[in-house]
Amino acid sequence: IYIKKINTLYLYANKAKETFKQYHQLLAFIENETFTSEILKQKQAEIKIENQKASEIFLQLSKILDAFDQRNNMIIGVFANSFALRDLHHCHRIEQWIDTYLEKVHSWFEVIAFFDAQNSLANFQFNHPNFTFPTIVDHTTSLKAENLGHPLIAQEKRITSSIIINNEEFFIITGANMAGKSTFLRTVSLAIVMSNIGLPVCATDFEYTPIKLITSMRTSDSLSDDESYFFSELKRLKYIVDAIKDQKYFIILDEILKGTNSTDKAKGSRKFVKKLVDFHATGIIATHDLSLCEVSEELSQVQNYYFDAEIVNEELYFDYSLKTGVCKNMN
C-alpha cells in the first residue's frame, strides 16, 4: 500500500545521498579549523546545535540513506521487508530527520557556500600578491586609480591607465575599433566589483567610494521573447534610468543605441547622457560618435577621453593608453 510513496522517497533520497556525504566532510573541515577572524568564527558557530555538530548530523543522514539504499539487495529487500518492514522503518527515520533539522539545513548550506566563496577570494589574493587592496574613501572622488589594468591580461602584455573620476562626473570615451575602449570599460567595471567584495585590484594604487555597478555593454535580441536588438537596448536603458532614481550607481555604457540609424543614435545618446547628468549620475560611456563629445561644451560634469590609433610603417598601431580629449583618428 505504501510502495509508491516509498519508491518516490527513495528516488529523492538516492539523489541526495552523495551530496550529504560530501557536505558532511566539508562541515567537518570547517568545524575543526581554528580561525582568528571574527566573521569566520561567527560563521563557524552557526553550524552547531547545543552539543551536536552539523557534520555529525549530516553523517547521520548519510548513514540512513546508505542503509535505505540496501533495499536493492535481493535478500535484504525481500526478507527484511517481509518480516521487519525495513523500508518503512528507514522512511520514518528519514522523515524524522527532516522534521528535526529542516530549518537548520538551509543555513548550514549557506555557511558552506560562504566558506567556499571566501576560500576562492583568498586564493585569488594569494595568487596575485602584486595587486593592491582598495582604500575606501568618502569624499568627492568616486574612483581614483594609478596604473589600472585588466587582471585577466598577462602582465607582460598589460597596458595600464590612470584615472580620476569625481562624484557626478561622466566620462565620454572615443576611439577607433580595437583601440581599447571596451577593454577599459571592463577593467573599470571589474575593479569596482572586485573592490566591493574585498578583493585586491590590478593597480598600484586604488581609492574609491563603495558604490553599486550598473552596465549596458552586451545587449542582445531575443527571438523567444520577440524582442529586437533596439528594443532590448531601450529596455536596458530604461532600467538604468529607473534604478538611479532610488540609489547611486556607477554607470558603464558601451556604444548605446547601436540598433538604430546614425542620426537617431546621435540624438538619442546625447539626450540620454544629459538625462544621466540631470540625475547627478557618475560613470563612463564609450562611443564612436564624435558629436557626443560636444556635450562637454554644455555640461561641465562631462569630460572627454580617448584611445588613439596611428598608422606606423603602413600598419595600424594602437598604444592602448587613455588620453584627455577627443579622438582624431578613427578607422
Predicted ranges, named:
Residues 121, 127-331:
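ATPase nucleotide-binding head domains, primarily ABC-like/P-loop NTPase cores
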Residues 1-176, 183-213, 235-236:
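Alpha-helical coupling/stalk and coiled-coil linker elements that connect catalytic or binding modules
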